[in-house]
C-alpha cells in the first residue's frame, strides 16, 4: 500500500502547478498536462516520489538521523513548525539565517546566548536588573527565539534537509549542497529539481498541499521511532 493516495493528493490540490509562463523546463517529466494556462503535475509520479522520500526518511530516522524542516513562506510556516515538533525534529520557519549550516559555530553562539537569557529569566536575575535592561534583554530573547527556536536543541549539523520550495529556500539548499547534506524537497513546476536529492513534485503554494506532504514526512520519522520502541520493548 502506498504511503499517500491519489485521492488525498487531489483533495489537497497537490496537482496544481504554476502558470505555464513561470516554469522550469527541467520539471517537464513531472508535468501531466496544461489546463487554463496552469501546469498540472503528474500525481502518479508524486505518489512514487513520495514513497521514495518516505522510505529514505524512515531509514534515516531509524538510524538516529536528524532532519531539519525548512519552510519560511507564509503557506508553510505553521505546518513546518507543527509537523517538526510532532515528530521531534528541528525546523526553520521564519527567515533562513545565512550560515545556519555553513557557519554552524556562529549560530551555536547565538543559541548559547538565547539559553543564557532563558536561564536569567528562570533564576531571578531579571528581578535584580534595571527595568530598562530587562526590556532590552527580553526583546533580544524574542528575536533569537523567533529565528532560532526551532534549532535550539540542534547540537550538530542535521543528516538531511526537508525543504518546501527550494527556489524560495535557495540559500538553505546551497548550504546543504556545499556540505553534502541530502535534501528532500517539495518541488513545484517553477523549481530546479537537479538541486534536490529526493524530489516530491507538488504544489508548494497551497496550505493544504504543504500540510499533507509535510505530515507524511513527519509520519515517516514517527514510524521509524515506533519501530525502535518496539525493538526496545522486545528486548
UniProtKB/Swiss-Prot annotation:
It comes from the Bacteria. NCBIfam families: rpsB_bact. The gene is rpsB. This is Small ribosomal subunit protein uS2. One of its GO terms (biological process) is translation. Belongs to the universal ribosomal protein uS2 family. The keyword Ribonucleoprotein applies. GO terms for molecular function: structural constituent of ribosome. Signal peptide: none annotated. One of its GO terms (cellular component) is cytosolic small ribosomal subunit. Keywords: Ribonucleoprotein, Ribosomal protein. InterPro entries: Ribosomal_uS2, Ribosomal_uS2_bac/mit/plastid, Ribosomal_uS2_CS, Ribosomal_uS2_flav_dom_sf.
Amino acid at each position: 500500500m502506498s504511503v499517500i493516495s491519489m485521492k488525498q493528493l487531489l483533495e489537497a490540490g497537490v496537482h496544481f502547478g504554476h502558470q505555464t509562463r513561470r516554469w522550469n523546463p527541467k520539471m517537464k517529466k513531472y508535468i501531466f498536462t496544461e489546463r487554463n494556462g496552469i501546469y498540472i503535475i503528474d500525481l502518479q509520479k508524486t505518489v512514487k516520489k513520495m514513497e521514495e522520500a518516505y522510505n529514505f526518511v524512515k531509514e534515516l530516522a531509524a538510524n538516529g538521523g536528524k532532519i531539519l524542516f525548512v519552510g519560511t513562506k507564509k503557506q508553510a510556516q505553521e505546518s513546518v513548525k507543527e509537523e517538526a515538533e510532532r515528530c521531534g525534529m528541528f525546523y526553520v520557519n521564519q527567515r533562513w539565517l545565512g550560515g545556519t549550516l555553513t557557519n554552524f559555530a556562529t549560530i551555536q553562539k547565538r543559541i548559547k546566548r538565547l539559553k543564557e537569557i532563558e536561564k536569567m529569566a528562570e533564576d531571578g536575575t531579571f528581578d535584580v536588573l534595571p527595568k530598562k535592561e530587562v526590556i532590552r534583554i527580553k526583546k533580544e530573547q524574542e528575536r533569537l527565539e523567533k529565528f532560532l527556536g526551532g534549532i535550539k536543541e540542534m547540537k550538530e549539523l542535521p543528516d538531511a534537509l526537508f525543504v518546501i520550495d527550494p527556489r524560495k529556500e535557495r540559500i538553505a539548499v546551497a548550504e546543504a549542497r556545499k556540505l553534502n547534506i541530502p535534501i528532500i524537497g517539495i518541488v513545484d513546476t517553477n523549481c530546479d529539481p537537479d538541486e534536490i536529492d529526493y524530489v516530491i513534485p507538488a504544489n508548494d503554494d497551497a496550505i493544504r498541499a504543504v500540510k499533507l506532504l509535510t505530515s507524511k514526512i513527519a509520519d515517516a520519522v514517527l514510524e521509524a521511532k515506533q519501530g525502535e520502541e518496539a525493538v526496545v520493548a522486545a528486548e
